[in-house]
Amino acid sequence: MVLIRVLANLLILQLSYAQKSSELIFGGRPCNRNEHRFLALVYSDGNQCSGTLINEEWVLTAAHCEGNKMKIHLGVHSKKVPNKDKQTRVPKEKFFCVSSKTYTKWNKDIMLIRLDRPVSNSKHIAPLNLPSSSPSVGSVCRIMGWGTISPTEVILPDVPQCANINLLSYSVCRAAYPEYGLPATSRTLCAGILEGGKDTCAGDSGGPLICNGQFQGIASWGSTLCGYVREPALYTKVFDHLDWIQSIIAGNTDATCPL
């Protein structure tokens, strides 16, 4: 089975395939306080996701993180002990690849959010640049988030967890999930540890996949049992959506995503 890693009302919704909109990093360690200045904690309708600040006014996350009463928190490390420079925003506008907000297991799970007002750079807040090149298979990638740290129950950490995983060939994910008939090509990335033990999980959806220092992916979906052997996760490929992202930010709200 597959998990769309969303943490709904602090419960993992286990569907026939579920997305990671609310996952914690399974098999990780607490992130360094200063290594995730771009990481956003996103809440909507009782669900938890992550996002990535790409400039003072825009955040990227997963489309399946969409919900009402959304709040976006920046500058967060410990949930219990807020940083003095924490800033909270709500969406001014949300943009999706398609007007119906639909997405598939292999395409269009991306949402671009314009904040109601810009955030200020600070000790714990700074944007992450968009990628300048496409990632290579074999790259070491960093994942992070406040999602559950257990594959079988909801155990949420106070601080974000970080872990290193590997960028794998997309064919590995096709082979791992034959029941979903993934297409031969896709605008998603396949990443994980084939031996298992490290993965995004429920509550981590929408968070970044950072490969060799570049923001390359958005946590989308994966195995119901996070970190399971030979069942890596899939991430929306940021590089393939650069034209769409940059066009929207420039004011061309009619821009369309790549097919």
Swiss-Prot record:
Active site location: 64, 109, 205
Localization per Swiss-Prot or TrEMBL: Secreted
Cystine bridges: 31-162, 49-65, 97-257, 141-211, 173-190, 201-226
Any one biological process term the GO annotation gives: proteolysis
One Pfam family here: Trypsin
Residue ranges constituting the Peptidase S1 domain according to the UniProt record: 25-250
Expression (tissue specificity): Expressed by the venom gland.
GO cellular component, one term: secretory granule
EC numbers on record: 3.4.21.-
Propeptide: 19-24
Signal peptide region: 1-18
GO molecular function: serine-type endopeptidase activity; toxin activity
Keyword annotations: Disulfide bond, Hemostasis impairing toxin, Hydrolase, Protease, Secreted, Serine protease, Signal, Toxin, Zymogen
Chain's role: Snake venom serine protease that may act in the hemostasis system of the prey.
Oligomer status and interactors: Monomer.
Assigned protein family: Belongs to the peptidase S1 family. Snake venom subfamily.
The protein's name in its UniProt record: Snake venom serine proteinase 2
Annotated source species: Crotalus adamanteus
